[in-house]
Amino acid sequence: MEHQLFCCEVDTIRRAYQDSNLLNDRVLQTMLKAEENYLPSPNYFKCVQKEIVPKMRKIVATWMLEVCEEQKCEEEVFPLAMNYLDRFLSVEPTKKTRLQLLGATCMFLASKMKETVPLTAEKLCIYTDNSVRPGELLQMELLALNKLKWDLASVTPHDFIEHFLAKLPIHQSSKQILRKHAQTFVALCATDVNFIASPPSMIAAGSVAAAVQGLYLKSTDSCLSSQNLTNFLSQVIRSDPDCLRSCQEQIESLLESSLRQAQQHISTETKRVEEDVDLSCTPTDVRDINI
């Protein structure tokens, strides 16, 4: 029998065990103090930018999210990239023709911060249909670093999610799906301009509360009822319960509108495909042709 070599190596990323010391209250309080230093200006569209409007930000944010999803980036990459983008736009007037270049640059930086194998400049340029050259991306990277004052360790909503999950009376089997739902809400909030001024801790708490509400986990424990959960999380982040409740409602409303738009897009595409099939399957009678 011939000797055969079996390669058992895989491309899975090696991860360290979760350190419980990173989930203590001292770390949480430090993040709550630090998050204010990384908040972008909520009115930069009026005060700083002359060409860029909220609709353009929405378009480039959706594109950035699609790139991150297709490249299977870490969950933290997209919100961090959007934080860089908003902070840059808060201080530097930018032409609308350079907005996609800025978005690609922010993903480039965030990927370096959070990925074991970061995105390359060449790959990001491909996603711009080669409208951006690698050299331009690297030049923009230096400009972005300068405007961000080389402070890239932004506090994002993802940093708070694990702290909240560790404090909630949730079975371990439910934590994974709850975490995934909360991360999805965080990414959704990052695409919407209405959450630019919201602190990361508020977005994270609202996302966790909305996830618990959506998964009906509140029925398993009285502590997870809507009012009790809101009061508890507001105490953790030192916020007013009404503000947190309003944030949660905004997130739920954003989810509904996003799902509605997605369904409309799917139905439109389906109708278009059906029309194309009908046209291709129905031969034209020569007598109907007006020569």
From Swiss-Prot:
Q: How does it assemble?
A: Interacts with the CDK4 and CDK6 protein kinases to form a serine/threonine kinase holoenzyme complex. The cyclin subunit imparts substrate specificity to the complex.
Q: Tell me the Gene Ontology biological-process terms attached to this UniProt entry.
A: camera-type eye morphogenesis; cell division; DNA damage response; G1/S transition of mitotic cell cycle; mitotic G1 DNA damage checkpoint signaling; negative regulation of transcription by RNA polymerase II; neuron cellular homeostasis; positive regulation of G1/S transition of mitotic cell cycle
Q: Any keyword Cell cycle?
A: yes
Q: Which residues cross the membrane?
A: none
- Enumerate the UniProt keywords alphabetically: Cell cycle, Cell division, Cyclin, Cytoplasm, Nucleus, Phosphoprotein, Transcription, Transcription regulation, Ubl conjugation
UniProt xrefs under SUPFAM superfamilies: Cyclin-like
Q: Which Gene3D superfamilies match?
A: Cyclin-like (1.10.472.10)
| Family according to the record | Belongs to the cyclin family. Cyclin D subfamily.
Q: How is it modified after translation?
A: Phosphorylation at Thr-282 by MAP kinases is required for ubiquitination and degradation by the DCX(AMBRA1) complex. Ubiquitinated by the DCX(AMBRA1) complex during the transition from G1 to S cell phase, leading to its degradation. The DCX(AMBRA1) complex represents the major regulator of CCND1 stability during the G1/S transition.
- Quote the subcellular location field of this record: Nucleus; Cytoplasm
The record describes the protein's role as: Regulatory component of the cyclin D1-CDK4 (DC) complex that phosphorylates and inhibits members of the retinoblastoma (RB) protein family including RB1 and regulates the cell-cycle during G(1)/S transition. Phosphorylation of RB1 allows dissociation of the transcription factor E2F from the RB/E2F complex and the subsequent transcription of E2F target genes which are responsible for the progression through the G(1) phase. Hypophosphorylates RB1 in early G(1) phase. Cyclin D-CDK4 complexes are major integrators of various mitogenenic and antimitogenic signals.
Primary localisation category: nucleus
The record's section on Pfam families has:
Cyclin_C, Cyclin_N
GO MF assignments: cyclin-dependent protein serine/threonine kinase regulator activity; transcription corepressor activity
The organism named in the record is: Danio rerio (Zebrafish)
Q: Which residues carry this modification: Phosphothreonine?
A: T282
Give the matching CDD domains.
Answer: CYCLIN_CCND1_rpt1, CYCLIN_CCND1_rpt2
Its protein name is: G1/S-specific cyclin-D1
Any one GO CC term of this protein is: transcription repressor complex
